[in-house]
Amino acid sequence: MAGQTADPRTNEHDEAVLRLRDVGVRRHTTDQLILDGIDWTVRPGEHWALLGANGAGKTTLLRLLGALMHPTTGTVEVLGSRLGRVDVRELRARIGHVTSAQRVPQDLTAHAVVLTGHSGTVQPLWRTYDDEVRARAHELLTELGVKELADRPYGVCSGGQRARVLIARALMADPALLLLDEPFNALDLPSREDLVEAMHQLAAGRPRLATVTVTHHLEELFPAVSHALLLREGRVLSQGHVEGVLTDPLLTRCFGRDITVARRDGRWSAYSGRRL
């Protein structure tokens, strides 16, 4: 597709976690075209950033990846299964999905919230959690750096702590794919940096895990992010390795204003306008 950055490692026969071919989505009520001609492949161990202005189609695209909706045209394969030819309930159980809008009972402890990831429920199903499952929930809290929150009510945890608890919850099913929908939303600087570090360590410890992170801010990308896809008005503007995609010209086109990008020690930043 014109405007896309080719990935030299792409091979149609490679193993894929996600494979989208000529995907389009129209809004049923208005026939508005939301996504158009999306081609995209994500492989094990790749960590993608999904960026675009408000209304570019990021939320709709993430819903497709999470098997929460079907495309109007084209094909979507998630974890080797084509949407429309698979029981999406079983498929969703193999996908980790984290969003700040998740419904979580505020009085549950952090450990109980993580346990609900095993049963895929909002409320705990205590009889289904044996000692091994409970121990795994503790291990995931430790892996995300929040083991001290195990007995703390979720409702009194900070925004950054909640984000890490929800990621631990998503990992209970040992997914091959982790979708993160603006996980840094409303976090202060220390909480953002704690989550960036936690995600970087998570990626290092799980070499086969693939992630897709929706964000508006390059500063939120953890160093292990290897690829990026830019959406503009429902179409892919560019995709591929971060070095070739997160550039001044492409981000300027993506967001419609002059943007300057910098990278230091594996971390990205961007600003718009003149330096003062």
Write out the residue ranges for each language-model feature.
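Catalytic Walker B motif of ABC-type/P-loop ATPase nucleotide-binding domains
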Residues: 178-182
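H-loop (His-switch) and adjacent beta-strand-loop-beta switch element
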Residues: 228-241
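Helix-to-loop junction immediately C-terminal to a conserved catalytic motif
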Residues: 66
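Conserved ABC ATPase signature
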Residues: 153-157
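Conserved catalytic motifs of ABC-family nucleotide-binding domains
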Residues: 174
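The feature captures the beta-strand-to-loop junction immediately N-terminal to the Walker
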Residues: 51-53
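Conserved ABC transporter NBD signature motif
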Residues: 74-84
